């Protein structure tokens, strides 16, 4: 069973072959434990996937809106359009900020070949991917809250993005404990290289960090949503 896992800021296809005895998974999916309730059966695992997917959809919509607003709101539009001009002129510092995302360090290798991976390992990879955004988004909210003349629309979106990402991570951690109770998880969240830029008193550095963050979370939110949908299909057999 070949699944295409491609992240927007990577080039080339990544094919992931899940070989953790899918026939057993499919059989288990049809017999998932549920809690009997009046009017039907409530499946905690399925409901958690539904909740996480809804949060991921919200995360993606907000990230997309924030990315656009930072380009067109007077608060940041001047700096963002200047950065775009510098990318055209091939300024290496700005090109990197507008194309490289620290979260890529948590991705499966982009080799273009079939990779054997167990469901638990797949979940762990996604946990580290989502977790890589905990610190950057937390500090973005702190810095925006302390910055003069920040529009409420930008600050509120940043807060909602941070909250949704944090809740998705919590859902994924819970799902892992139910899917693979014996699995040992070592969370390794990569360092965001623009954190010092974000905390800088230099206005250009601060906005360059926001330029990188807004680009990457916009792209990564699409990836998170895709992976949640694929995992939901593999583990629960629903919405495939």
UniProtKB/Swiss-Prot annotation:
Signal peptide: 1-30
UniProt key word Cell inner membrane: no
CDD domains, per database record: prolactin_like
Bridged cysteine pairs (disulfide): 34-41, 101-216, 233-240
InterPro entries the UniProt entry points to: 4_helix_cytokine-like_core, Somatotropin/Prolactin
Originating species: Mus musculus
Gene3D superfamilies: 1.20.1250.10
Any single Gene Ontology cellular-component annotation: extracellular region
Residues with glycosylation annotation: 212
Name recorded for this polypeptide: Prolactin-8A6
Protein family (similarity comment): Belongs to the somatotropin/prolactin family.
PANTHER family, A to Z: PROLACTIN-8A6-RELATED, SOMATOTROPIN,PROLACTIN
Tissue specificity note: Expressed specifically in the spongiotrophoblast and trophoblast giant cells from the junctional zone of the chorioallantoic placenta.
Keywords: Disulfide bond, Glycoprotein, Hormone, Secreted, Signal
Annotated localization: Secreted
């Amino acid at each position: 069973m070949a699944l295409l896992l491609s992240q927007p800021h990577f080039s080339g296809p990544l094919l992931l072959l899940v070989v953790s005895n899918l026939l057993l998974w499919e059989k288990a999916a049809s017999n998932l434990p549920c809690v009997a309730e009046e009017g039907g059966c409530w499946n905690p695992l399925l409901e958690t996937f539904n909740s996480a997917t809804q949060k991921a959809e919200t995360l993606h919509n907000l990230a997309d809106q924030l990315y656009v607003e930072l380009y067109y709101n007077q608060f940041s539009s001047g700096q963002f359009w200047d950065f775009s001009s510098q990318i055209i002129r091939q300024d290496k510092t700005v090109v990197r900020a507008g194309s490289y995302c620290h979260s890529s360090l948590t991705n499966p290798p982009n080799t273009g070949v079939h990779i054997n991976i167990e469901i638990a390992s797949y979940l762990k990879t996604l946990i580290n991917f989502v977790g890589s955004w905990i610190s950057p988004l937390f500090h973005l909210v702190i810095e925006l809250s302390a910055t003069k003349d920040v529009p409420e629309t930008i600050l509120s979106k940043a807060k909602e993005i941070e909250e949704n990402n944090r809740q998705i991570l919590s859902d994924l951690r819970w799902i892992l404990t139910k899917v693979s109770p014996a699995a040992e998880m070592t969370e390794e969240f990569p360092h965001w290289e623009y954190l010092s830029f974000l905390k800088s008193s230099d206005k250009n550095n601060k906005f360059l960090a926001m330029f990188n963050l807004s680009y990457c979370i916009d792209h990564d939110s699409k990836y998170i949503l895709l992976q949640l949908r694929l995992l939901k299909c593999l583990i629960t057999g629903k919405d495939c």
